[in-house]
Amino acid sequence: LKEKIRLYIEENKEELFKTIQDVVRIKSVVGNEQEMQLYMKKKYEELNLILHEIEPKYEKVSAHEAFIDSGIPFEDRKNIIGIHKGVSNGKSLTIHGHVDVVSPEPYSNWTMDPWSGDIIGNKLYGRGSADMKAGLISNWFALKTLIDLGYPIAGDVQLHSVIEEEAGGGGGALACLEEGFVTDGYISTEPHNLNMTISHGGIMYFRVYVKGRTAHAGLAHEGINAISKMMKILSALDELSEWRAKNVKFDLFEKGSGQSVHLNLGVLKAGDWVSTVPGEAILEGRIGFIPGETREEIKQLVQDTIMKSVLGDEWMDKNPPVIEWFGWSTEPWYQDPENPFVKLFIENAEDVMGHKVIMVGRAGGNDARFTQYYGKQGLCFGPIGENMHGPDECVHLDSVVEVTNVLANYIIKWSES
């Protein structure tokens, strides 16, 4: 069977690549996913899958402890699920992908049209090509391969095409699981370079407000410059970032991301006129943390760092910085590497590809984390990508073929295990 699968995919890979081109050309920036979901619905219909369209229910998902509010209304934004029923009582499997992408702007940084789907050599280019439309289509093509070959699959296979992973996954993967679409195993084909990801860091966003006092630039001595006051906080957070990068280590993250934790200061807003002393400065940051660290202790660490940095400043003593937490707030995810689901996947992938699969973790989040709330097993495995979220994003097509082969074989092995 392994050779039949390999031959089918090799002989039909142009259809696989063409389908990836089709979806890359759909501008499915987070919040505007429905054109892409209509396309995926048609692809699932081609396989005669049992279709479910899931429009997230805010009241339901927002009550879940893992929910992240994207701030984007759920109306007319559906998740598409296609189910292939097993012929017996074999193990069930979800293969997951998200249709949403981040904006490609600024366009001037690209050397080509971000929505072109152009193929140059072994690489297919475009926003979302790697993250993660190639994986999404590999999922579909792996199941299509087995259906076209007429192989009876023992357990149910669910294909999940979801929205808003880039914004936290609350209305996407979480909404599907909350509606009861839970299986024995869960694979997300994120572009993780043919490595198997079983863990990711916790993530939290924070915002700091610093108050100043406005004045005319010609009388700046009468004002309090909020930017200058914010610089003390910036410096302290930079020092914290450097210290954590050197001292906080988690082996799986070191393998997968090259550094276990990051503290990124991503947004700084201050002032509205060059001749006015700025009266307010606002800083937004993202801090990552490893399994074993908790949200509560990381919050305290950030808050203590900020407040200590302004000690002794007469203005800041009377007008202390205000700290708030918003957006992403997730605990770390860690899948037991000794679980049979994981061990069988590695065994299968190494057998199909003919080389060792490295088990890694990632500093960035993904939808597989939601499985831990349902007592199920999850992992990520996907193609080789470059420049995700950046200009000239691309995916390596030979790795897409590898992923599709691995998935098709694993569907059989897992369902019969």
Segments predicted by a language model, with ranges:
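Metal-dependent amide/peptide-bond hydrolase catalytic core
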Residues: 1-4, 11, 46, 74, ...
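Acidic/His- and Gly-rich active-site-bordering loop/insert found
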Residues: 1-124, 153
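Residue-level recognition of well-ordered beta-strand positions that form the cores
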Residues: 83, 96-98, 162, 205-211, ...
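Acidic/histidine-rich catalytic neighborhood of metal-dependent amide-processing enzymes
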Residues: 124, 132-205, 255, 415
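Short, conserved micro-motifs enriched in small and acidic residues
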Residues: 122-137, 150-152, 221-227, 394-401
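Acidic-glycine-rich active-site phosphate/pyrophosphate-binding loop
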Residues: 104-119, 198-209, 347-348, 379
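Residue-level signal for inorganic ion chemistry
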Residues: 23, 27, 44, 190, ...
